[in-house]
From Swiss-Prot:
The lineage of its organism: Bacteria, Pseudomonadati, Pseudomonadota, Gammaproteobacteria, Cardiobacteriales. Transmembrane segments: none annotated. Pyridoxal 5'-phosphate binds at W103, T153, D172, Q195, N236, T237. It catalyses: O-phospho-L-serine + 2-oxoglutarate = 3-phosphooxypyruvate + L-glutamate; 4-(phosphooxy)-L-threonine + 2-oxoglutarate = (R)-3-hydroxy-2-oxo-4-phosphooxybutanoate + L-glutamate. This is Phosphoserine aminotransferase. Pathway: Amino-acid biosynthesis; L-serine biosynthesis; L-serine from 3-phospho-D-glycerate: step 2/3; Cofactor biosynthesis; pyridoxine 5'-phosphate biosynthesis; pyridoxine 5'-phosphate from D-erythrose 4-phosphate: step 3/5.
Length: 358
């Protein structure tokens, strides 16, 4: 095998090497059945066993209470931007949203097609460097829910806490899923695309409070959470390969020590990188410190030209995916669960060398 690189892309994400090796081992012959897991029927006992354990592990590891169901739905977070509103605003009413960046804005745009959305806070156009203090946010009590994007990958922003706002929360945790505990007591829906921390792209992992599962006769069955729950995530032929990899990743998360382990690792990785950025004159991070993301670290060199030279040269040192989002430029290192400390250390070594030469 050729040397693996350190993958800092924002998604699809770097996956744990033991998971990839297990998938490689079983690729042509899963559990001696003579077929790949990509070929076996989703109605077979083998796949139903994978699905059952995946759903069970997903719920157990994230600490979701019994009054939540867990769903695996083909598509991604963009689809959930609409589905959350389609299900929770089907009977009218309005919802709030904290428009904290590009992904919250996308969620707002989709939800507005369905019902009335109230912007409780709006990020400035372009580069955003701060977030609102959620504890002091004015939230009308008549809102059906408030939508929050827990971590904004583009600007490197993350809410350090997700407090009770007095109305139920709908959380998009796509980029920090399974990196920290979640406030289940006041959530109605928690969702995320799996491609950041958990599996290949093409699927969303969704937790819905059971009391929110209702039949909506004016809604296509595929877009109704109740139908997915009633079908045990088998409403249509599911993305079996993504579910299989998710199953392996969840087992790996459990073996490593669960969410508590990865919360500590996220703090350790990001702190090391931010400390290096803050203690030299070549790199800078403009995000207000208390809102800095532990998952997506953004930074800049003294010029756009050097930013480009940095990520291009980094690729020749087995450090890939460091180019910032096209909307804001700069540089970005995505530190998802499978990113080892060795990757951060290698990045810092390169940053030091690059700064010395420029």
């Amino acid at each position: 095998m050729s040397k693996r690189v350190f993958n800092f892309y924002p998604g699809p994400c770097t996956l744990p090497l033991p998971v990839l090796q297990q998938a490689q081992k079983e690729l042509l012959d899963f559990e001696g059945c003579g077929m790949s897991v990509m070929e076996i029927s989703h109605r077979s006992q083998r796949f139903e066993a994978i699905l059952a354990e995946t759903l069970s592990l997903a719920k157990k590891l994230i600490g979701a209470p019994d009054d939540f169901c867990v769903l695996l739905i083909a598509g991604g977070a963009h689809q959930q931007f609409a589905m959350t509103a389609l299900n929770l605003l089907a009977d009218g009413g309005s919802a709030g949203i904290v428009n904290s960046g590009l992904w919250a804005k996308r969620a707002l745009e989709e939800a507005q097609r369905v019902g009335k959305m109230v912007e409780l806070w709006r990020a400035p156009d372009g580069k955003c460097t701060t977030l609102p203090d959620l504890k002091t946010l004015t939230v009308p009590k008549n809102l059906r829910y408030v939508h929050l994007t827990s971590n904004e990958t583009v600007d490197g922003l993350q809410f350090p806490e997700l407090p009770d706002l007095g109305v139920p929360l709908v959380l998009d945790v796509s980029s920090d899923y399974y990196t920290r505990p979640l406030p289940w007591d006041y959530c109605d829906i928690v969702y995320g695309g799996v491609q950041k921390n958990l599996a290949p792209s093409g699927m969303a992992l969704v937790f819905v409070r059971k009391q929110c599962l209702r039949e909506h006769t004016n809604l296509a069955r595929f877009f109704c959470y109740k139908h997915h729950a009633d079908a045990n995530s088998l409403l249509n032929t599911p993305p079996t390969w993504q579910i299989y990899i998710l199953h392996l990743v969840l087992k790996w998360i459990e073996q490593q020590g669960g969410v508590a382990h990865f919360a500590a690792l996220a703090q350790k990785r990001s702190a090391k990188l931010y400390d290096f950025i803050d203690n030299n004159d070549f790199y800078r991070n403009d995000v207000e410190k208390k809102y800095r993301s532990k998952i997506n670290v953004v930074m800049r060199t003294p010029s756009d030209a050097l930013d480009t030279q940095f990520w291009q040269e980094a690729e020749t040192h087995a450090l890939v995916g460091l180019k910032g989002h096209s909307a804001v430029g700069g540089l970005r290192a995505s530190l998802y669960n499978a990113m080892e400390m060795a990757g951060v250390e290698a990045l810092i070594d390169f940053m030091h060398d690059f700064a010395q030469r420029h």
